[in-house]
């Protein structure tokens, strides 16, 4: 009977500690794991089609015409 009471009190104490720390740390995680769609978008090369402007930040699918600064 005493052992059962000790186990119940220990479980309640651990549960309370987890709930308290979960409330305190909400939104403060520094190094969050990237979601799979974020990882995929970072790995996907996006290119601009024909006639779109190109430059340092925009990559063309084929080539960039430096005179017109458009994709060819």
UniProtKB/Swiss-Prot annotation:
Residue positions assigned to the propeptide: 23-46
UniProt main location, coarse: secreted
Highest taxon listed in the record's lineage: Eukaryota
GO cellular component, one term: extracellular region
Location within or outside the cell: Secreted
Keywords annotated in UniProt: Disulfide bond, Knottin, Secreted, Signal, Toxin
GO molecular function: ion channel inhibitor activity; toxin activity
Annotated InterPro entries: Conotoxin
Pfam families reported for this sequence: Conotoxin
Entry comment describing in which tissues the protein is expressed: Expressed by the venom duct.
Keyword Cell inner membrane: no
Disulfide bond positions: 47-61, 54-64, 60-71
Signal sequence annotation: 1-22
Similarity comment text for this entry: Belongs to the conotoxin O1 superfamily.
Comment block on domains: The presence of a 'disulfide through disulfide knot' structurally defines this protein as a knottin.
Protein name: Conotoxin 3
